[in-house]
Amino acid sequence: MTFARHNPVLTLAAVAVVAFTAAFAALTLANRSSSPPAGPPAVANGTAPARSTDARIRQLQAEVHAAPKEAGGWALLGDAYLQKVRETGDASFYTRADGVLKRALALSPNNVDALVGAGTLALARHDFATGLRYGEAARRAAPSLVRPLGVIVDAQVELGRYREAARTLNRMVALKPNLASYARVSYFRELHGDLGGALQAMRYAVSAGGGTPENVGYVQTLLGNLELALGHTAAARLAYGQALAGVPRYVPASVGLARVEAGERNYGPAIRRLRAAVGRLPLPEYVVALGETEHAAGRTAAARRDLALVGAEERLLQANGVNTDVDLALFEANHGEPARGVALARRALAAAPSVRSADALGWSLTRAGNPAAGLRWAKRALRLGSADPAFLYHAGMTARAAGRTALGKRRLRRALARNPRFSPLYAPRARAALR
């Protein structure tokens, strides 16, 4: 198999654009003890019973109190705090993780768990260069372990170092073809426009299973996202339902179901589901999804009220060390001050020259009234062959605004062909632009 079937440098020996890179790094932490399957698994293994993260935190806190000079205990506590962020969206746990991981590294600078944890934390905060440094340090400390490779490949992808990421993925899958490695293969293929291959790899990830129910629910949700991107709404519903069966009230899966409902113009249930999701996990991307769905439903005043919350949520993340430049740039381009979006996107691109940063800059420039400059960055955003309808929509509207009408129409048609319901707000605008 290959990571990207049309690129000869991306070969894979054994085997969604995901907005939060740390999710993959956390999968590496959570799957540290899973044994690799003999080949692509045929049947889902389900999830083993697991203690709650709160219980794990309490136990580890007691252990480090009893043995404060043991670096391993502090590293595991940092791991548990990072898992808590995944489950609650409470970014203050990043600050707690930072403190205990620094203590672990002060006690033992070459402790692999602490180095991987510190790299995961850096990725969660979108400090990809620092994440890469910690990942490389962990690999030097333990060359035969797979866990450092997850941190390294996530950082390489976000830094736009895709050829290096392909080589790292080859090694990771060869060492341990498990949930964490299959999920990364899926994302890498998705970035290169190979949604069929991405779907196949994500099915392997789900089948491989893992010891943490939330992690299994997460990859089941990613599987649903890929099915939805391919227009397979029934399969998407099934995947989201399986995630919710394993992790009741799991917010990412609930948001996925809301996206299905919004795509079917079933706005009432979608809005209710999104509002409940935001109440439990008020991440900016969920608030934006709620506001845009309300816009599509004609509830303009409610949309304005909800979108006004995004800035507050972003500030909370920033207060806990999270760099939100790309996400905030797109928000400003769509709903705020596009000129500020340009500044944020330029800063994001300087720190991490990925296709995501290029897309954010191209769209921000277009929305700020400079589509000619935006066109160049839209082309860079598509350079891997992405089939992401959002990228294609941005590129199509940019080309149209720059006077490249035929090019714009081709890109908009590609976006709608990939998924005619990719957004309750922007898919109708794409269709209107083609009329």
Where are the predicted features?
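Residue-level recognition of tetratricopeptide repeat
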Residues: D79, R86, T120, D154, ...
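Structural motif corresponding to the intra-repeat A-B loop/turn of tetratricopeptide repeats
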Residues: K84, T88-A91, R125, L159, ...
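Short coil turns that delineate tetratricopeptide repeat
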Residues: P68, P109, P143, K176-P177, ...
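TPR alpha-solenoid repeat register
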Residues: G73, A114, P148, S181-Y182, ...
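N-terminal leader/linker segments that initiate helical-solenoid repeat arrays
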Residues: T2-L107, V112, R133, P420-R421, ...
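Canonical tetratricopeptide repeat
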Residues: L76, G117, V151, R184-V185, ...
